[in-house]
Amino acid sequence: MNLVAYSTPKPVLQKLISRFGHLPAGQGVSFSQSYGPSGSQARAVVAGQPADVVFLSTGLDIDSLVDAGLVPKRWTKAPYGGIAADSVVAFVVRPGNPKHIHGWKDLLKPGVKVVTPNPFSSGSAKWNVLAAYGAMRKSGANDHKAVQLVTKLFQHVVSQDPSGSTAANTFFSGQGDVLITYESEAYAAFAAGKQGKLVVPKPTMLIQLPMVALKNAPGAAKAFIKYAHAPKQQRIFAATGYRPVVKSVLKRPDLAGWRKKYDTGPAFKIQDRLFGGWLKANRVWFDPNEGRMVGIERSVGGPTH
């Protein structure tokens, strides 16, 4: 079975795959795994890369597979809306938080150097951009002012890698003062021994991570997705830094520490009126010809593809 995923969840997916092989539905099933920037992965599948299950970082990337006739149009009608796990947009700062970064406006302070991926290749980066804009709007800025503040934020960006994982590698190699990333990416880095401090800004954005089977995938693909939503596997997500979509698993005593970590207050969503869903948000912000990020990137000399 061919599993194509964005770069960040490789450790948790390998745990799920290992356990799946011990179940009746997984016996005799071997996996070919591919990891990379979410947008690049989606484009590769459209271009013919073999895929049975995709786990990508935005619904927008799944919709591109729908447009190519590879995924059912009603994929969001699946249990949990087709989402396998959640996260939120968060910051990682240096140990001790020497720049005193606690919220979005702190990223705009003189001398603060920010690391975030390139939104024209990385789904993580798209979440980061929309989270920054949404936070400014939620804090009282009108649309024009919020766009100005996002532009100012990108004047502080010192590195735009192609994916969330490579951006994290850049930060942990010593570049920048703050990394904008998935909360789950931060926990994965800490588990691997990287040094830093997690800051979940208020407000922030809920990241919804879709996992779907392609139209012509074998039955084992749907079985794997069902398995990924079962409580035991959702506990694996929860204990690996992802917010489970099966919320009841957080009631378990062994996950009490994670439950406390995930209790960071409400988060706004891509479906909110402020964004109007992925299709509208992508058109407004990331269209390669007219999107707001094209102008912002050009103004700071950043990449636009």
Model regions and ranges:
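N-terminal segment of the mature folded domain
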Residues: 1-121, 255
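Extracellular/periplasmic juxtamembrane helices and adjacent flexible linkers that interface
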Residues: 218-305
